[in-house]
Structure formats: structure tokens, C-alpha cells
């Protein structure tokens, strides 16, 4: 459940858990500006910088974030990117966050945007994106110490906020103790500024032990003092604790113009890179990303597995991009998705039905009898309802990403060889003609990435563990009366059905799409009539009372097909990371979840290149490292 907040007669939010106000008696806005922003030398300190990272312990009601965002927005010398990383063990509801800002009307436009993204805050990291990707809030839900151990970046400013250190309940984590400050120090560079409102001796001593040099400064009446300082340890931090070096934006060649490649190109271009995207086809999204439409929905498992957690981060990232770039109803539709658990009943994690029930219901819950009836399924059918889900046309998302300023697309550019120069790469075609040169190359060409990587890395390096998987979907225009006979939302679980896909931007010309087949070790995209029969057979299992109204179209020759070749890894997780050659990366292996993972992987790649805060926990990010050897797929469940 969201943290319970009581509202005092003067409108001040109060925490029953901590027995303390969320704001200082002098006013939260003054404290945010004077104690934290000014205490860290902002906005002057970030002038002219490519990026700036603020770390906060204690998100509370988000006021410090909103004030920092406002300062960035109104500063002509602002950095290109503002990262704000905040930990919070007891997240408040979106409604309370918005209510708390009513007394500060100048912040309301920003607060409404924040409110709209404050959903589904289960334990872990949540990347919220504003200002077309230039302001990024990474909310880390959980104990500050544990959350910061999952991060890897250098903060430029640190806000130490929270309730009075003397009021901590016995069952709550302590964000003012030595171990928390050690975790904070691990995320600091020499010279990182720190600010807080408390001058408690225990806090000053703990900060000093962790390498912070602090001093008292005049406070806001009635408070006499605040605390300011900087990270300047008398020792050199261990190299193993240091994140990567913040590199400057440069030139990049991305090979492959599908979801993975276009997402990488857009993420790098937003950071100032000059990106050339090469593809052998005559247009973008001619490979697996040319699918007429795909279902976007999270994976669910009773133990909240690695794949489940990664899929939620990916779905959130894709939804943000779709809302910003695509036309709802034409390019995509967030209708929600019903998962009919045909093969076995999927159980929700136990915590989703108790402590985190409200946040979990923003993601997935048991399907209602009404939703089942809409699919002509019995009320006893095992099914889930994915709230933040729907269908997307992958090609539309690819096209939108490739229009990002700084991205240049070249078609008919078949890459034959990569040649390493002293400080760059030459990308050549099969005849040895130079297609492009850049300091960084990202392989995002699906299964073809394996051969390109093998030719570019030292011969002793093992091959990438990538497997080609052919898939075919079947589709047809709606027969008469189909609108009333079909569900209003996609259904998945044993194959899938997208019931109402507008074609060519015409909302009145609708088609249904079902599939897909799954043929391993086949890199050919030829169409097979027997695959259409297979897809319709699976649809009979998925939706027994809906399928008969569509299968007749197969007999009348009205069903059409599309086939493509996906690329997967043994773990069924994407392959993202550097290869055994300088400035050569791979972003591939997303299987049937390109829509889920492309945007997330692109942001993770950019974060690693620029030593930015990670968009997901370190242990999840590490699971995406490229795998090598033979590609033998494992089960998802």
C-alpha cells in the first residue's frame, strides 16, 4: 500500500510512521531551494555541462526533484541531460504527491507530469522520463543502502533528506547511519557537493568517516544551521568501486535498422552523438521489426523472476516512447492485454496480494469475469489482465526513432566487413567500399550480428550465442460482424490475437493478426501455407469460441501472412554489452520481445557509455551481458 499520509489543518503533510512533517516549518519550497539547490551550488555549478547527476536519499513527496527540474528548465545554461536519482523506502501515492504541491502553483505543471508517471512503484528501480528524455528521474524503491549498491554512477550533487534522525521507528531502515553514507560515498566523485538540513553530531561524524568534509551554514529561520560539504576523502577510492569515465558524445555507426538499432540510435542522438544507421534493406524495419503489429505486455511469474522484473522495466520504457512519439489508435493502442494461461496457470507473486497490492495492480491482476466473457471464455478460465499493455506497430516506432535529430539512415548498405583503425572503425561493404567511419560501432543486426562480430574480434574469441528463429503471423481483414464478435483488446498466452489493427492509417479498415510460429535455426523468411493453419489451430486453443469466426477466412483464401527471422540467446534475454574489440558493442537477441526490450537496452547502453545512472538494478543489467558459444534456448518459466 502507498505510505499513509495525514494532512494537518494548515495543509502540511504529516507521516504517522515517523511522527514528523514532510516539510520544514519554514516551508518546503524555501528548504528545497535554499538548503539543497543553493547548498550544492546549483544552478551555477552545472552551467555548460553535458550532464548533471543529483543523488537524493528520501524522495518523500518529490518536492526537491520538482524544484531542481524547474531550476533546470528555466536556466539557459542548463546541461543537456539532468539525472535525478532518489531512494524511497515508503513511496507516497501519486495523488498525495500532487496534493502536496497545490500550495506551490508554479510547480503544478511539472507536478502533474510527475503524477502521471507515478504508477506501479514496486520494489526496485523505475526510470521516469520528462522533457523529451532530457530530464530523467530514477526512483529506487527500497532501503537506500540496498538500492545504492545496485547503482553505478558518479553523483555531482547529493541531497541528504528525510525525517528527523531522532524519530526513526524501530522497524524502518535508517537513512542517516554510517552504512547509508558509505553507500552514498560510493556514488560520489572527488568534489561532489553535499547538502542537508540536519546538523546532528551523529550525522556530521558519519559523513566525516566516509570522506565528506562538512561545515555548518546559516539556516532558514527558525532553524539556525544547515550542513554543506563536499566529498574529499584523505584516501583514494578503490578502482573497483569507481564507475566508468564519462565520455563525450562522438560518432557512431549502428548496423541494423530494426527496433534494437533504431532505439540505440535515438538514445545516443539525444545525448549529442552523430549516428549513422546502416541497413541492407530498402527501408527501415524490413526484418523481424516489420511485423504488422506486436503485443506489449509484461512477463509474470510467482517468484518475480529476472525476466519478469526486466520486462516491467522494458514495458515502462516502451510506453514512455510510444506516448511521446506515436499516434494512439493508429500506431499503437494501450488497451490492456488479457493473458489466457492455457498451458499452465500463472500465479502472481505473494507480495502482490499483500504489502504491494496497490502498486502491483497498476501492472497485472487476475482477469475479471467481464473481461473473460468479452473473450467468450468461461469465468473459471485461468487468466491475467495486464493493465499497462496493448499493441504497437514496430515499424512506426522504428521510423519515429530514426527521425531523432542527429540520426542519419542509409538504406541498401550491406555491411561486409569492419576494419579497426587506430582511433575509429571503418565499415565496408562486400566489395571493400567504405560505407561509414566512426569511433563507435553497435551491432544491432539480429542474427547477422553473430557473423559481423566474429569477423571483427580476435580469432580466439568465442562466437556470440545467438540463434535464428523464424516466425510467421497470419492476418486478414475483418469479416462482416467481426467487430462485435472479437475482443476489444489483444489476447496472448498460447500465441496471440490482435483483434482490431487499423491498416494504412484507416481506422475503418481493420484487420486481425494471430501467431506466431516458432521455428529454431531457420534464417529464411519464406511464407509457408501450413504455418497459417498452425496459427489458426493455436487460436482455437487460445480462444475456442472466437476462432471459428475467423478460420473460415483461411478456407476462402482470405488469410495473408508475414514472416520474419528473430534472434534469441540461450537465456532468452537480450545480448547487450561491449565485445572483445575497442568501441564495438552488440545490442541484439531480443527474440519475440523486441518491443519490450529495445528502448530499455538502448538506454542501458547509453548509460554505460556515459557513466550515467543505470535505468535498472545492476544485477539485472549484468544479466544482459553477451553470451558466447552454442545457442541452446532454455525455458522462460
From Swiss-Prot:
Cellular-component GO terms for this entry: cytoplasm
HAMAP family in the cross-refs: MnmC
Compartmental location: Cytoplasm
Family that this chain belongs to: In the N-terminal section; belongs to the methyltransferase superfamily. tRNA (mnm(5)s(2)U34)-methyltransferase family.
Membrane-crossing segments per the record: none
Region (FAD-dependent cmnm(5)s(2)U34 oxidoreductase): 255-637
Pfam families the UniProt entry points to: DAO, Methyltransf_30
Names of the cofactor(s): FAD
Role, per record: Catalyzes the last two steps in the biosynthesis of 5-methylaminomethyl-2-thiouridine (mnm(5)s(2)U) at the wobble position (U34) in tRNA. Catalyzes the FAD-dependent demodification of cmnm(5)s(2)U34 to nm(5)s(2)U34, followed by the transfer of a methyl group from S-adenosyl-L-methionine to nm(5)s(2)U34, to form mnm(5)s(2)U34.
Record key words, sorted: Cytoplasm, FAD, Flavoprotein, Methyltransferase, Multifunctional enzyme, Oxidoreductase, S-adenosyl-L-methionine, Transferase, tRNA processing
Gene Ontology molecular function: flavin adenine dinucleotide binding; oxidoreductase activity, acting on the CH-NH group of donors; tRNA (5-methylaminomethyl-2-thiouridylate)(34)-methyltransferase activity
Main location: cytoplasm
GO terms (BP aspect): methylation; tRNA wobble base modification
EC annotation from Swiss-Prot or TrEMBL: 2.1.1.61, 1.5.-.-
Region (tRNA (mnm(5)s(2)U34)-methyltransferase): 1-232
Name of protein: tRNA 5-methylaminomethyl-2-thiouridine biosynthesis bifunctional protein MnmC
Catalytic activity: 5-aminomethyl-2-thiouridine(34) in tRNA + S-adenosyl-L-methionine = 5-methylaminomethyl-2-thiouridine(34) in tRNA + S-adenosyl-L-homocysteine + H(+)
